[in-house]
């Protein structure tokens, strides 16, 4: 539960105005604090923090219908997890002389509001729960496969195979340009157990001189080369359906940098509410399919990391050329490529906040898992 940094006495200057603004926001109001003049008696022990109040105002602005009283209450009492400021008092309301200075809520950076929003969204995730496991009778006559490699491409492939054709069988390791695979690993981690921020995560692997295990294609293939059914590395996307024994594959869904960052932050809070394995299941099976599509491109490898990625890709290509197992496609296909897209901003805080607000006011977001 949130506690404001400064709890004014009921009769202190500005307190009645502040409680009037709280009542205004609870009833769907959108007037900024600086323009508010009405008063009301105290409706609680302490005033909500400026972050919580401003987030509620933004939700009211975005909503097509009044928010439910429950959602408004949850926003006003939500904690602001992660690194950042404690709950802040409103400027113009007398309070404690200690602690952070009071603020005009409209001037708060987007990141401060995202902290509150992720707390509410994480509670939603736990309450929604997991969807039902897909069922299907096994097909003993059908070829079964296991899938590894690029985690976003592998997720799409598993979806195309379905539970009846996944299991013991040949391991299909799916590769792509290494810069794309790195972006896909980080993005998928955001929708599983969480991760460090994108650039911090890249620096971690560069400093270690290693690749994340899921996209170290040669290491993955060598682990499974002697297993029943063997292994094949597929680098040609046009050959992947044949390798999996399907007619076609749906296009892989790559969330934008804003969606991945919001998921990363939600995962951090979900991890405080449920055990690690349950968090991974909730993030990958509940949040992943429900996350709205945005116009922002996925994260991309910045110029300062491109030399390291290029060298790692060249090394991987040489290893694949000498491989003692089938490789479908040109090993040079793992070389990093420039997408030509405008890269996503390093800190897409404003877009992350916009997405969080969009989700919180969408009734479909909180529909029970099916």
What are these model-derived regions, one by one?
Residues 1-370:
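Anion-recognition interface
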């Amino acid at each position: 539960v949130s506690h404001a940094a400064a709890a004014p006495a009921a009769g202190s200057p500005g307190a009645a105005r502040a409680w009037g603004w709280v009542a205004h926001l609870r009833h769907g109001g959108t007037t900024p604090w600086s323009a508010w003049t009405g008063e009301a008696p105290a409706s609680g022990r302490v005033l909500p923090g400026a972050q919580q109040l401003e987030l509620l105002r933004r939700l009211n602005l975005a909503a097509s219908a009044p928010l439910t009283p429950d959602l408004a209450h949850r926003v006003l009492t939500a904690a602001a997890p992660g690194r950042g400021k404690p709950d802040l008092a409103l400027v113009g309301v007398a309070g404690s002389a200690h602690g952070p200075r009071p603020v005009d809520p409209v001037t708060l950076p987007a990141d401060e509001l995202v902290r509150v929003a992720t707390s509410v969204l994480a509670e939603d995730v736990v309450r929604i729960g997991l969807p039902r496991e897909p069922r299907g009778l096994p097909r003993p006559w059908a070829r079964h496969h296991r899938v590894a490699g690029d985690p976003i491409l592998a997720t799409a492939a598993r979806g195309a195979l379905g539970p009846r054709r996944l299991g013991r069988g040949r391991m299909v390791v799916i590769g792509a340009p290494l810069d794309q695979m790195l972006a896909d690993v980080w993005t998928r981690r955001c929708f599983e157990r969480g991760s460090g921020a994108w650039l911090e995560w890249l620096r971690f692997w560069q400093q270690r001189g290693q690749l994340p295990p899921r996209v170290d294609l040669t290491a993955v293939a060598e682990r499974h080369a002697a297993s029943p059914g063997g292994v094949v590395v597929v680098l040609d996307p046009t050959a992947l359906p044949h390798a999996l024994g399907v007619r076609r594959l749906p296009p892989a869904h790559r969330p934008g940098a804003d969606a991945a960052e919001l998921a990363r932050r939600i995962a951090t809070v979900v991890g405080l509410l449920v055990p690690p394995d349950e968090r991974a299941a909730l993030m990958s099976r509940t949040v992943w399919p429900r996350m709205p599509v945005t116009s922002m491109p996925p994260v991309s490898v910045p110029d300062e990391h491109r030399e390291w990625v290029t060298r790692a890709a060249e090394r991987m290509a040489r290893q694949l050329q000498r491989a003692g197992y089938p490789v479908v496609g040109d090993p040079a296909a793992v070389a990093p490529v420039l997408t030509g897209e405008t890269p996503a901003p390093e800190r897409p805080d404003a877009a992350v906040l916009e997405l969080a607000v969009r989700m919180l006011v969408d009734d479909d977001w909180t529909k029970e898992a099916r």
